[in-house]
Amino acid sequence: MTRSTRRSRTVALTASAVMIALGATACGGSSGSSAGGAPGKGGTLTILDKADFDHLDPQRVYTTEGQSMDQEIVRTLTGWDETGSTPKLVGDLATDTGTPSKGATVWTFHLRHGVKYQDGTEVTAPDVKYGVERFFSSDINGGPPYAAQWLVGGSDYKGPYKGKELGSIQTPDKYTIVFHLNQPVADFNETTTMPGWSAVPKSHDTGSTYDTHVWSDGPYMIKSYTKNKELVLARNTHWSQATDPIRQQNVDGMNVRFGQDESAIDQQIKADAGTAQTSIQQWPIAGSDLAQLANDPSLKIRYYKIPAPGINYLAINTTRVKNPKVRQAIEYAIDKTTVRGAFGGSAYGDYATTMLSPGIGGYRKFNLYGANPAGNLAKAKELMKQAGNPKPSMSIAVENTPTEEHFADAVKTALERIGITVNITPIDASSYFSTINNTKNQYDLTWGDWIADWPNASTVLPTLFDGRLIKKNPQANQDLSYLNDPKVNALIDKAAKTADVKQRNATYGQMDQQILKDAAVVPLMYMNFSEMAGSKVGGVIPDTIVAEPSLVHVYIKK
């Protein structure tokens, strides 16, 4: 998953890891009881954001921020209960976590009775079927690839707008839905925690404009939505706590305000005056502020640092930068110390040398391009010499934030030392990923980040590096390197067919090394997510699945 710390990902951490991240203090704003007494009712939570969401349409959303917000609006077949010491997979719309059969190629879910939309009508299995079928429509795009990859007939299905249904999704009755898969997927019920595995009533589907008209079956519904300005959520009066094991409905509403400078958001929350006391930021702390705020003792109770086994990286377009020697030279030339400084220093994360993060099944520690995070300029120049001393000009795409632009400056400085001219192209943060995921883009270098959709390498490497998916997803391509290496593709297929977890993880480790041998990406940092809340905001817990502060139990202190 993605996003400016906003892309995907779904990572479960141990309780000890979370406590370390919060400074080993249970008095941090990490739970209702620890943040000032029992949850109260009423009040409005203000959410401050630099940019609008790429999408809220549940079948299109594939960012951490969008997925976090969708948790308030839509319910999924399964979900994560994070009130205990570790996240627990539970039924959400479904009564339980599903039943596999036929070697995990068939999954059956039974829906709860009495789950209501915002107009009081009941959620049904055909609504979920229709919602999942929307994944396949070319009229809407941007979401994760799993439905197309795993559902029988998915490779040829064009979505419900063409007037046809997908036969591999069956609804034998009003409350039962059955998925037929083309391969065994033992963790399919973790896939169904993602927003797209939710109900969309056909009568309220507005197609490409559904982003601003999402029909709610969660505790909050969209009252008004002015893109790039403000999203206002109000209570869904037909939502029932008795049917929802995950969420609460404590505040009266939520106002998301877009378009504020990232550093201005930091300083507003830090000052804790007026409405800032009942506000939380949903944009990461600016790199220029992070070191100071992370080490300010007075902010400890309001500061959230969430380790997220995810990766911040520089993708090299292998179809544009075709010479592997030049790509290898870039690997050695990048100074990760200045790059990390742009993102906020050590508080942002550790230096990365692999695409799989520690904590992800399949991670293997290795470093193909030297131990010095500052790079190896001599080696980089030697590789450029072997490539014939070209003097290429390359474009780099980044979000239009000070943090990202400082990062681009660091890349530009590093590469110009080896004769590469770098042209920086800032892209509006609200449309950044939809722009770079379009295969018509002309960028040589692209900043990206990724968090596993759940803690398995299957949600990282195949999505980011299966070159066979590029043509299938021309407007939602996640392979920013445009890598289509037969060796990598073969390893992806091998891993998918390997039932033994240890052997499968070994294959993913081998795959990670091959991708780095291809010099398709420069891994930069294993990321942390850092954000703050006002002093009157309670009930915030670190969502170690979406890697955002969770709002499902949030309340305003009286």
Locations of regions flagged by a protein language model:
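N-terminal lobe/hinge region of extracytoplasmic solute-binding protein
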Residues: 48-102, 213-215
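Gly/Pro-rich hinge or "lid" segments in bacterial periplasmic/extracellular proteins
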Residues: 164, 180-248, 253
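Long beta-strand-rich cores associated with HINT superfamily self-processing modules
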Residues: 531-558
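Alpha-helical secondary-structure segments
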Residues: 123-133, 174-181, 218-219, 249-253, ...
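Extracellular/periplasmic solute-recognition and catalytic clefts
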Residues: 223-234, 255-318
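Surface-exposed binding/hinge segments that line
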Residues: 110, 127-129, 140-201, 224-226
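Structural transition elements
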Residues: 220, 347-386, 403-406
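Extracytoplasmic/peripheral linker and loop segments enriched in polar/acidic and small residues
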Residues: 170, 423-432, 462-534, 558
